[in-house]
């Protein structure tokens, strides 16, 4: 049994595909660093991530797959599911070995099916994030939303919010992965008045320089609660609490008790999202 270990990045996985074909090996078990080796396995081959090798593999995929097929690979990878590594590796290897243009649509292949289903789960959560994100307004005019999705969907929802809220600064922060995106009204240095923004940030994650990918060096010092997304009282806009109370009142007022269906509500709006939703997290 041939075992490859890699750094659990997409470039690392593509490099593993390159190494597999370069060494002309057929059956390879791919494991992320730290995963337990199978019993009686030989000394594993450690994959050293190489952006050049990864780029060559990706260009090869562009020749073999449609845009939907490439999209399926990148979106499924955002799931961050360790169980995807082997099926995705197998799928990419089959693309080059079989050279079948319709392989990406072959649902009878277990590897293709797993990648497709994973892609669907990520896209489903992407839709839910667009629906369930709730913003609060800080005194400096910045809008904050804290989320904690199962999958790493922030990179594929930012354009949606940039289109809809391009006239106001906002920060969407993933508490689970400890990073977020800040949208500024103008490109260039971050405004010093943005009290929600950390001192350091990296630009270039969105369509233009108005979007910054940010992390906080000390999350304990941020002016909001990561457990429920609430802004600290001294930072919250003077009238935002009023709007929150009005929204909760409206939410209760439109509820028809005789038609309440908790099971349906949980199916449409899973409980794991409630802690960050104004209408569900109480006062």
Model-derived regions, located:
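Ala/Thr-enriched low-complexity intrinsically disordered regions
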Residues: 186, 194-195
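Charged, alpha-helical interface segments at or near domain boundaries
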Residues: 31-127
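Glycine-biased, low-complexity coil/linker segments
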Residues: 194, 200-205
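N-terminal ordered "arm"
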Residues: 1-52
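Internal, well-folded beta-alpha domain core
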Residues: 101-185, 210-221
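Long, compositionally biased intrinsically disordered terminal regions
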Residues: 167-169, 181, 212-283
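Short, hydrophobic/amphipathic alpha-helical patches that form generic packing surfaces
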Residues: 12-23, 90-94, 159-163, 245-252
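Short, charged/polar micro-motifs that form catalytic or ligand-binding hotspots
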Residues: 3-11, 43, 47, 105-108, ...
């Amino acid at each position: 049994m041939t075992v490859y270990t890699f750094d659990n990045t997409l470039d690392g996985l593509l490099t593993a595909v390159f190494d597999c074909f370069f060494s002309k090996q057929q059956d390879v078990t791919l494991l992320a660093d730290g995963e337990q080796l199978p019993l009686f396995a030989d000394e594993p081959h450690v994959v050293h991530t190489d952006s050049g090798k990864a780029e060559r593999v990706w260009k090869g995929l562009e020749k073999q797959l449609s845009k939907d097929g490439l999209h399926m690979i990148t979106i499924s990878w955002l799931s961050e599911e360790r169980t995807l590594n082997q099926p995705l590796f197998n799928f990419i290897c089959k693309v080059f070995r079989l050279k079948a243009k319709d392989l990406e649509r072959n649902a009878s292949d277990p590897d293709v099916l797993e990648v497709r289903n994973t892609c669907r789960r990520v896209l489903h959560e992407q839709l839910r994030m667009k629906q369930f994100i709730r913003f609060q307004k800080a005194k400096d005019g910045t809008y904050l939303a804290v989320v904690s999705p199962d999958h790493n969907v922030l990179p594929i929802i930012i354009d949606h919010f940039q289109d809809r809220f391009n006239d106001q600064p906002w920060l969407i922060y993933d508490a689970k992965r400890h990073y977020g995106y800040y949208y500024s009204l103008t490109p260039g240095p971050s405004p010093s008045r943005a009290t929600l923004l950390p001192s350091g940030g990296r630009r270039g994650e969105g369509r233009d320089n108005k979007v910054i990918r940010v992390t906080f060096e000390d999350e304990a010092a941020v002016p909001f609660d990561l457990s429920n997304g609430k802004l600290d009282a001294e930072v919250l806009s003077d009238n935002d609490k009023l709007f929150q109370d009005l929204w909760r009142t409206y939410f209760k007022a439109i509820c028809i008790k005789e038609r309440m269906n908790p099971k349906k509500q949980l199916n449409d709006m899973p409980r794991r999202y409630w802690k960050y939703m104004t209408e569900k997290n109480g006062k």
